[in-house]
Amino acid sequence: MKKIICTLCLVMSVLCVMAQDSKVVNLQLETRMDYQREYLDGEAVKANSGFKGKYLNVILNGTINEHWSYSYRQRLNKAHADQSFFDATDWIHLTYRLNDNWSFNGGKQVVGIGGYEYDRAPIDLYFCSEYWNNIPCYQLGVSTTYTTNKGNDSFLAQICESPFNFQNEDLYAYNLMWYGSHGWFNSIWSVNAQEFAPGKFIYYLALGNEFRFGNAKLQLDFMNRATDDHAFFLKDCSVMGELSCMVNKKLNVFGRMSYDVNKTNSVGDMCVLPGTEITRLGAGLEYYPLPEGNRNLRFHLYACHSYGKNGNP
């Protein structure tokens, strides 16, 4: 069944920051409220139209001493099971910084998957790929990061609970990442093995690339997914891209696209299900009214058009 979705939203986001003089405690409050209209095959989707409260986050982080630091983000508008307040906790982790090269992290953290769309905070995204919409990206685990002497490259190794451990089957994910910062070119790449059933894995190759040209930048991501049951390249993959330009200190304009496809019969991909081939195209602007480049308050206006087949319920 072919589905066509058009969305037009007016978005306002407010960021309030409160911090003590000490570096030990830094407290932030984030919220985002939208007015949106969504249509499916020309008919208004009433449940997804009107005023919506999207995010209400509390962020607490700080530096304890030269070696120890912590970070915590709680999503106050996210439902959680009665027995697990962690369901609404995006992350809470402790970091030990051995020296300028090595650091170690433990707690609930972001699953180490490459790509700029995946790396950005959800509050800063307006429409996303089908993969992004369905990946449970915060899990308990441990990681270590090595940064080169010049500071241009960092390599992360992580072991954490699998994003697909829905039935508490003791499943794990193994992730390797490269963060590169080289002037006009930056990167967030990863290779991943995510256990979706006992002893069965789905493998990712995720290549996030950012190209900078003056006030403009192009973020282009490619992700390929495969299990032992289907061919490795291009049968199950996603492409995400965004071209943006800061017109001045207060106005940013952007165009964005994503393409998700799964032409396999494998049950391993739980984010982009078999039979999916969907494209999203859109554009928008961000306006920051406060002076001196202050981004604690912003307004958004954007439109998105989606078409294709979606195997996800």
List each model region and its residues.
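Positively charged n-region of N-terminal signal peptides that target proteins for export
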Residues: 1-4
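Short, low-complexity, polar/charged sequence segments that are solvent-exposed and flexible
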Residues: 46-50, 123-127, 163-164, 175-178, ...
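Outer membrane beta-barrel
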Residues: 21-37, 47-162, 170, 179-181, ...
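Outer-membrane beta-barrel pore domains
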Residues: 23, 30-46, 65, 82, ...
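Hydrophobic h-region of N-terminal signal peptides that target proteins for export
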Residues: 10-18
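Loop-centered beta-sheet repeat module
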Residues: 155-201
